[in-house]
């Protein structure tokens, strides 16, 4: 008989400044976040977007799988509490198990994951405000037996807000990848997420452009959402354009069916994600650990 799992949430009121102070690596006096320690090898990658609908979660999922295919130990936290989708995209149907009062995250395609999707019905909304969200994120970090993966990807909700503030405090050495589309309007909105990262001292490492083009059956390439948005954003932020991902039916189908396209390196889209993973792992190596103190202007 499986043990029933609950996600405990403590209610408290705090302003933004207090919330940031509370999250500096030692949330609520419960001990340090595992990935906060200076000698931990794990690279924490926040995957962000300015708006919904740009394919951020599918990029997170497939990047995680691609990093795993390169021989890395990879974990994903689905921090998009209101719009969780990582379990479906990875094809995970079993909930976490419980061993010694710790959650053991389920795994698929070489990627371990934790998500609100394991604790809430997929068709039911999660109606939470800041303090509840903050506590849940704390538990995702401290009450899960992560060990020490090479990469921890955190799928942030679109836009800016409490989730980003909490994660920035828990994990101030995180790196951020910003997902956008070629549309100028999407690029402008994504820019806000990047500027938010600067406010909380998170380093933006690169931009990933999704839905860059569509190749028709006749081999003609069509730029359905315009062109240049990803490059323009990368140039404005002074970071590289890490990769461009085409609009292909298999990407959507794989996300719906739990079969990430990055698992098949023989396909064009699989090879594209593999190259993005290589760039992230090799070309965007962290230079050094930065100071711990947050700068909120």
Map each language-model feature to its residues.
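Walker A/P-loop phosphate-binding motif and the immediately C-terminal alpha-helix
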Residues: 43-80
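C-terminal boundary of histidine-terminating zinc-finger modules
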Residues: 257-269
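C-terminal-of-GTPase-core extension/linker across diverse P-loop GTPases
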Residues: 267-290, 294-297
């Amino acid at each position: 008989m499986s043990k029933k799992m609950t996600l405990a949430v403590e209610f408290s009121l705090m302003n933004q400044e207090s919330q940031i102070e509370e999250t500096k690596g030692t949330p609520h006096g419960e001990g340090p976040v595992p990935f906060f320690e200076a000698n931990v090898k794990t690279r924490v990658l926040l995957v962000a977007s300015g708006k919904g609908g740009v394919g951020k979660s599918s990029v997170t999922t497939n990047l995680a799988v691609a990093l795993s295919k390169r021989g890395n130990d990879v974990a994903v936290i689905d921090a998009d509490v209101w719009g969780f989708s990582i379990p479906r995209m990875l094809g995970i149907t079993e909930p976490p198990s419980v061993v010694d009062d710790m959650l053991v995250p389920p795994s698929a395609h070489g990627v371990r994951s934790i998500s609100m999707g394991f604790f809430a019905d997929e068709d039911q909304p999660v109606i939470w405000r800041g303090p509840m969200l903050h506590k849940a994120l704390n538990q995702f970090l401290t009450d899960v037996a992560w060990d020490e993966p090479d990469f921890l990807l955190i799928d942030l909700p679109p836009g800016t807000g409490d989730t980003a503030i909490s994660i920035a405090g828990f994990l101030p050495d995180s790196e951020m990848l910003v997902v956008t589309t070629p549309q100028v309007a999407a690029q402008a909105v994504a820019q806000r997420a990047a500027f938010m990262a600067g406010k909380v001292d998170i380093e933006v490492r690169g931009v990933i452009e999704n839905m860059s083009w569509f190749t028709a059956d006749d081999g003609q390439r069509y730029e359905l959402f315009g062109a240049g948005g990803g490059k323009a954003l990368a140039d404005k932020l002074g970071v590289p354009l890490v990769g461009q991902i085409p609009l292909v039916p298999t990407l959507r189908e794989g996300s719906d069916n739990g079969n990430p396209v990055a698992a098949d390196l023989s396909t064009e889209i699989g090879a594209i994600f593999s190259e993005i993973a290589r760039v992230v792992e090799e070309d965007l190596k962290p230079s050094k650990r930065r100071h711990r103190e947050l700068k909120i202007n």
